[in-house]
Amino acid sequence: MALGTAGCSRIRDDDCVETIGIIGGIAWPSTIVYYRIINELVAERLGDDGLHSADLVLAQTDFEEIERNQREGRWDRVGVLLAEQGARLKAAGADFFLLACNTVHTADHYIENAVDLPFLHIVDPTADQLIARGFSTVGLLGSRYTMTGDYLVGRLQKWYGLSVLVAEGEHQDNVHNALYQELAKGEFLPGTRNKFKAAIAELISRGAEAVILGCTEFGLLVRPEDSAVPLVDTTVAHAVAAVDRALTSTLL
């Protein structure tokens, strides 16, 4: 279901607060980042005491099964597995939901059609940020599925008119392999960071005005100082958009 007008799951101090649904664990390290950013922003926006926290529910499935079906090209199965988690979110009272992972948005059409909740797509807040900052040509680092697929590149190009450059050859291999062999397991190695810096530099040499960190684990490894152009982290953009959505009525 496309994201629509904000509803209201409950009243807090006479204000409407929506419950955020998160399909996480894909992989678990970045789900922690979502949880931290969302709660920090809610605490910041709802009061000076810093004790407010988000209304949210989290569901996840076994990442090994997700990864195996990705590798086998069974995106329909990925969609089924994640849609099951979406149903759990709805039953738990979520008002809308997000996928805390870029790559599984490859199956977004399966999931969005199967889950009876508004869906906050990761690409849209990322594109909004890129456009607001005046970028027209952007580089992309992500899993191989993300860099060669259509859900992110196609959406940025067709819906938002952005030109997208993706890592190629050795750089694409290094980034993809690091994701599944290290980052998804919570391992962040200096040598791998250097490979990412080289991939970023290559994108900049081809004309990238900014580089999208198009995997929710990448921001745990790469830092702003690793790039000569701005880095746009999809995790941050997505988490901020979730809070914006949840608190829309509260802050009117």
Predicted regions and their residues:
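Non-catalytic structural scaffold of enzyme domains
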Residues: 3, 8-252
